[in-house]
Amino acid sequence: MIVKTETIDSRLENWINEYQPDKIVVVSSETSFKLCLPHLSIHKKIDNIIYRLPDGESAKTIDYCQDFWSAMMRNEVTRKSVIIAIGGGAVLDFAGFCASVFMRGIACIYIPTTLLSMVDGSEGGKTGINFYGTKNIIGTFTKPNAILRNVDFLSSLPQTEVLSGWAEIIKHGILQGSVIWDMVKNGIPSFDDEEYWMELVRQNIQFKKIR
C-alpha cells in the first residue's frame, strides 16, 4: 500500500485496533529514527519498545539479532506482540528475520523509508542477515503482515539513496518496457509531486508481483 503520512497513522491504528497486540516493538535505523519516526503517531505511544540499528548492511549480523531478541525477552514480548520496522532494506531484512523466528514467528509490519526498499526490498517475503562475509546466507521466506509505503519520506533521502532506488526503477522499466519505462523517460520527478511518486511506486510493486 502506498500512502501519505496521515494515512499511515490511520492504517496503523486500524491494524492495531483489530489485532490488539499486547506490545509494540519499533525497529528503526538511526537515520529513520531521526527523520521519519517523529512524523508518525506511533512515536508518541510511551509504552512502545524502540530498538535502534545502525544504517545499512552493518545491522544485519547475528550479534544484533541476539541483542534484539534479548531486549524483547527482557521486555516480555509475546507471540501476541507486533514488530514495526521503519527504515531501508537492511532494517526490513533484519526485523523480518528476527520476527519470523522469535517464538516461531510473531507479527511484523514494514514501513520502508528509502526508494529502493519501497520499489524492491519490501516485496517478495525474503528476510535475512549476513554471516561470515556472505550476504543474506541466513534467512527465511516470510511475508510481513502489512507494508505501508510513505512517499513523504523520500524528500529526506540523500541524493545517493535516491539514485540507488532510481537505478532499480530503470531496470524495472527496461524489463517491463511499457508504463514504467515511459515514466522513467520523464526523469526523476519533484518530491512535491506526491501523486506521481505514488503511481510510480505502485507500478513498480505491480511489476515485482508478476515477475
Indicate residue ranges for each PLM-predicted region.
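Catalytic phosphate-donor-binding core of small-molecule kinases
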Residues: 11, 130, 209
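A glycine-rich beta-strand to alpha-helix segment
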Residues: 81-90
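A glycine/threonine-rich phosphate-anchoring loop and its flanking beta-alpha core
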Residues: 97-192
